């Protein structure tokens, strides 16, 4: 059993870096572990123009410590009225790496999202033509659909018809949580991929209610039954190039998590890579770890893999209860892998 693994420097294909003071608090945690990151556009107001994306990218780079090599990859927030020309300009100028589809009111800051997929077909046609990936929060918002069934319903009702209408469109089904999503992506062609978070590999829905209401485990999509968690673990560790790393790290102040109407999101950036490594180790699949963290994502986005390497060591360490005042995923738990030469708690 190896006590050390070396991998090509990884990327994170789904992050929420927030803005303002929260951006200053969290960006270095992503930048210390990942060389590139796909940055979600659900700010207030959302990032819907090239100029807004450029300005947000500038703020991210200004907040990132100068000694870290980190490239934020910006995304456009799709609305019912967004212009195809705006997306094409941003993509061709290298400002937009992808566009994000939020069904209206599906998750945090998604009120301005798309209400009717047919209405944005001209946008999707443009994206397919220029090779711009579509990133999807794949849940229906129909209140009659149980929250635990909303991902499976989205695939059947919306994703499959969308892909039939736009067969050449590159699509990432983000933060998948169900066995149905695993099966759908596994059986699809090269134009469809999926990201998987560390928390959905570690917890099932029981975690939210263990001994009380555990708001730190509340995220969207919500964690599902144990059978779905096991399907995700098999997919992530399989070596299938359709699946790659996307943490969906989503920090919130404690007052926003612990309230009568708490926010969805798990802040996992500080120890995400170590969290993934533990899963691959437990599944006896460390030989596929580098592909999931460092190769499959760049291949899908048609970007070169990073050139330098990082090393992880088998070393038990305690995850702190708080990091910069925020509760990290695995708070108070012991992880069995650590990035070499990195302190157990990054001081920023």
Curated annotation (Swiss-Prot):
Name the residues annotated as catalytic in the UniProt entry: 248
Keyword list (alphabetical) reads: Hydrolase, Metal-binding, Pyrimidine biosynthesis, Zinc
- What top-level branch of life does the organism fall under? Bacteria
List, alphabetically, the InterPro entries matched: Amidohydro-rel, DHOdimr, Dihydroorotase_CS, Metal_Hydrolase
Q: Which reaction does it catalyse?
A: (S)-dihydroorotate + H2O = N-carbamoyl-L-aspartate + H(+)
Cofactors, names only: Zn(2+)
Q: SUPFAM superfamilies under this entry?
A: Metallo-dependent hydrolases
Q: Binding of substrate: at which residues?
A: 16-18, 42, 137, 220, 252, 264
- The answer to whether keyword Repressor applies is no
GO molecular function per UniProt = dihydroorotase activity; zinc ion binding
- Name its GO BP terms in alphabetical order: 'de novo' pyrimidine nucleobase biosynthetic process; 'de novo' UMP biosynthetic process
**Binding locations of Zn(2+) 2:** 100, 137, 175
Q: Name one Pfam family in it.
A: Amidohydro_1
Q: How does the cofactor attach, per the note?
A: Binds 2 Zn(2+) ions per subunit.
Which CDD domains does the UniProt record give?
DHOase
Described function: Catalyzes the reversible cyclization of carbamoyl aspartate to dihydroorotate.
Q: Subunit structure, per the record?
A: Homodimer.
List, alphabetically, the PANTHER family matched: DIHYDROOROTASE
Q: What is this protein called?
A: Dihydroorotase
The UniProt gene name for this protein comes to pyrC
